[in-house]
Amino acid sequence: MLLKIKSFLFSHQNIHLKSRNLWMVFGLACLVIIIRRIDLVTYPQFWAEDGTIWFATAYNFGWWPAIITPMVGYLQTISRLVGGISHLLPLAYAPLFFNLVAVLIRALPVMYLFSDRWYKILPNFWFKIVLALIYLFLPNTAEVHANITNAHWFLALILLMVLFGELST
């Protein structure tokens, strides 16, 4: 039994996904994230600092001062950038924009996991599917699930994946 599990996890069976298929994986990951909390799109609203700080600062002071203003000692660039860009939309759509950008950021690690840059690290395609499903269905993630305030955790994961991944050819 253990040998079967080992061969499943570490065999070198890899399916190379074309660019089109990577985008399909990305879209499927976004769909799973939205389905986990459907109110992200059916009843969008700001979450925590999304409205009170990121959107409000960009609204009151403009997008550039908002981007370069540190909060608690560091720059929250992505949060402030999304807050600034959201002013190009009608006010009623700003929370939806925040939520959709957060969903896209949350889905990025799944797409990157299936890219060819992770061929040597995780050669088994099925193991990548298992990892992606674990990542997408992690329990008790309501605090960080699809909001810009906590998007930096998923961006940190992407950074690690880029650092450990192979160079593109």
Model-predicted segments: where are they?
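Membrane-interface transmembrane helices that cradle and orient dolichyl/undecaprenyl
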Residues: 155, 160-169
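Start-transfer (signal-anchor) and selected internal transmembrane alpha helices
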Residues: 1-33
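Transmembrane-helix motifs of polytopic, lipid-linked glycan transferases
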Residues: 100-123
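Membrane-interfacial loop-to-transmembrane alpha-helix junctions, especially the N-terminal start
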Residues: 22-23, 68-72, 121-130
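Membrane-embedded helix bundles of polyisoprenyl
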Residues: 127-142
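Multi-pass, polyprenyl lipid-linked donor-dependent membrane glycosyltransferases
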Residues: 141-159
